[in-house]
């Protein structure tokens, strides 16, 4: 039987995989695993529950809150809120755990449930496994005064906004910023915090109706943001995804500024301020080689991890580093947050534009992105990537040809018969040529063997 929890909680089609019954069972199990200890004063354990504005979030939240409260957990219902805001509130309220109902950048029919431990930390695999195992046991059913209560938490958004403002190194007066909120969870608080920080704000993608989240807007569809930045002559644009745990940007000329470039700008700024722990940035193996070259020139090292913000977080915790992230725009400031925070990232980026007086285009020029070609080779035996001598020799020859001006990365899929071939080079033509050659070697050498009857 496959594992219920994926890389970011439980996610699937609402009323398909993710039913009200499953949400109730998950909550009952989490109540036992995460809220089994009463607080020191004898009070019931407490949990924060928040969601993005998907229509299905209402019934899933109701099921989660029923499962928690019927298991003896007091619930703070924070309503519609970004994922990083939910994590922050778990820590700020000293709650025992938190639940976020969202499918992030997925389309509206999907939804998901993920949990935060005390302090707003993501759960390790073994705790998720314990929750899944507990689902097969009898639910805990307290009676009388031991049942949990549900409290509507009306100032959740305001608390989060005050926290974000407290992190700013410089106010944003004089800046015009376009915000694309993806018709998602940040539709209320992102415009509010940028206005409170002093910026002139133009807002798009901030009219959620439960069905339009991520629909042609947000960080996965930057076209509308680019158009708005040019139309209004804005200094920059900021795009969130549905639950606002990521941020991509657009400069005043409409050029995309991705997660790697954002991290380069912020890492250099933190180092110059003496606030970048050990002068290290944590990034994944998929970050552009141009990031490593730029930061090396700035005296900053990169600690590489596997793809996924959970691996970035693990490395940051282990090494005591305070900045990390992914090319996709998940950026983590561990001095201020326990997870990727698109609002925090956007504010910090805008603050650098205001503080330095430079355009975002000029700031992002600290890094030169190398052309990157990615080919997904399907229908191959992904388990043989490291055992094929012919493939190893082909990779070695490609790396020798690229020298220090490029790199090769082969990544087998974790679930499908697919191998991803990624090549970076000084020019697009070279990257494409080498990637296509290696993809052909993968097709030939890792071809799936046909089983004859």
From Swiss-Prot:
Alphabetized GO MF terms: magnesium ion binding; phosphoglucosamine mutase activity; phosphomannomutase activity
Keyword Chloroplast: no
Catalytic activity: alpha-D-glucosamine 1-phosphate = D-glucosamine 6-phosphate
InterPro entries in alphabetical order: A-D-PHexomutase_a/b/a-I, A-D-PHexomutase_a/b/a-I/II/III, A-D-PHexomutase_a/b/a-II, A-D-PHexomutase_a/b/a-III, A-D-PHexomutase_C, A-D-PHexomutase_C_sf, A-D-PHexomutase_CS, Alpha-D-phosphohexomutase_SF
Post-translational modification as stated in the protein's UniProt record: Activated by phosphorylation.
Keyword vocabulary terms for this entry: Isomerase, Magnesium, Metal-binding, Phosphoprotein
Positions bearing Phosphoserine: 104
Stretches that traverse the bilayer: none
Gene Ontology biological process terms, A to Z: carbohydrate metabolic process; peptidoglycan biosynthetic process; UDP-N-acetylglucosamine biosynthetic process
Cofactor binding annotation: Binds 1 Mg(2+) ion per subunit.
Top-level taxon of the source organism: Bacteria
Family: Belongs to the phosphohexose mutase family.
HAMAP family tied to this protein: GlmM_B (MF_01554_B)
Function: Catalyzes the conversion of glucosamine-6-phosphate to glucosamine-1-phosphate.
PANTHER family for the chain: PHOSPHOGLUCOMUTASE (ALPHA-D-GLUCOSE-1,6-BISPHOSPHATE-DEPENDENT), PHOSPHOHEXOSE MUTASE
Protein name, as recorded: Phosphoglucosamine mutase
Gene name tied to this protein: glmM
């Amino acid at each position: 039987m496959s594992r219920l929890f994926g890389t970011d909680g439980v996610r699937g089609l609402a009323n398909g995989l993710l039913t009200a019954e499953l949400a109730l069972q998950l909550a009952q199990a989490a109540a036992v695993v995460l809220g089994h200890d009463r607080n020191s004063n004898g009070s019931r354990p407490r949990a924060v529950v928040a969601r993005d504005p998907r229509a299905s979030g209402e019934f899933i939240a109701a099921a989660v809150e029923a499962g928690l409260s019927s298991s003896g957990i007091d619930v703070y219902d924070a309503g519609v809120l970004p994922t990083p805001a939910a994590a922050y509130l778990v820590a700020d309220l000293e709650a025992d755990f938190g639940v976020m109902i969202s499918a992030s950048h997925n389309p509206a029919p999907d939804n998901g449930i993920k949990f935060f431990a005390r302090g707003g930390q993501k759960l390790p695999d073994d705790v998720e496994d314990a929750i899944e195992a507990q689902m097969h046991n009898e639910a805990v059913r307290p009676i009388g005064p031991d049942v949990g209560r549900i409290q509507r938490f009306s100032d959740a958004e305001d608390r989060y906004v005050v926290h974000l403002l407290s992190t700013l190194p410089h106010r944003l007066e004089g800046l015009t910023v376009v915000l694309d909120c993806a018709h998602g969870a940040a539709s209320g608080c992102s415009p509010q915090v940028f206005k409170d920080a002093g910026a002139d704000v133009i807002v798009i993608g901030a009219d959620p109706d439960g069905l339009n989240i991520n629909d042609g807007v947000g960080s996965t569809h930057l076209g509308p943001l680019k158009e708005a930045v040019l139309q209004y002559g804005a200094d920059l644009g900021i795009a969130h995804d549905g639950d606002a745990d990521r941020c991509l940007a657009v400069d005043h000329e409409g050029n995309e500024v991705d997660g790697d470039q954002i991290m380069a700008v912020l890492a250099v700024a933190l180092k110059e301020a003496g606030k970048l722990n050990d002068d290290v940035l944590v990034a994944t193996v998929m970050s552009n080689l141009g990031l490593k070259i730029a930061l090396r020139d700035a005296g900053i090292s990169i600690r590489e991890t596997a793809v996924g913000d959970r691996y970035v977080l693990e490395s940051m915790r282990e090494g005591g580093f305070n900045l990390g992230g992914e090319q996709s725009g998940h950026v983590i400031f561990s001095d201020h947050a326990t997870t990727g925070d698109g609002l925090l990232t956007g504010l910090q980026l805008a603050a650098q534009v205001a503080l330095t007086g430079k355009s975002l285009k000029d700031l992002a020029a600290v890094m030169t992105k190398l052309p990157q070609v990615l080919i997904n080779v399907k229908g191959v035996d992904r388990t043989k990537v490291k055992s094929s001598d012919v493939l190893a020799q082909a990779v070695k020859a490609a790396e020798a040809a690229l020298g220090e001006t490029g790199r090769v990365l082969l990544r087998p899929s974790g679930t499908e018969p697919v191998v991803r071939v990624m090549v970076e080079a000084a020019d697009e033509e070279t990257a494409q040529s080498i990637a296509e050659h290696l993809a052909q070697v993968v097709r030939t050498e890792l071809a799936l063997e046909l089983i004859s009857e």
